[in-house]
Amino acid sequence: MKRTFQPNRARRKKKIGFRARMDTSGGRRILSARRRKGRKTISA
């Protein structure tokens, strides 16, 4: 059986990168929540 995580740098950037997060209101909400929580990394 194939594993569920198939790493792909381009797809990762496109889906959960900083620019992708900043593109939508929901994404910006995610970033602010992670900043508020004090995450060391806020996006991929």
Swiss-Prot record:
Keywords: Ribonucleoprotein, Ribosomal protein. Residues 31-44 have a biased composition (Basic residues). InterPro entries: Ribosomal_bL34 (IPR000271), Ribosomal_bL34_CS (IPR020939). GO terms for molecular function: structural constituent of ribosome. One of its GO terms (biological process) is translation. It comes from the Bacteria. One of its GO terms (cellular component) is ribonucleoprotein complex. Pfam families: Ribosomal_L34 (PF00468). Residues 21-44 are annotated as: Disordered. Belongs to the bacterial ribosomal protein bL34 family. PANTHER family: LARGE RIBOSOMAL SUBUNIT PROTEIN BL34M (PTHR14503:SF4), MITOCHONDRIAL RIBOSOMAL PROTEIN 34 FAMILY MEMBER (PTHR14503). This is Large ribosomal subunit protein bL34. The gene is rpmH.
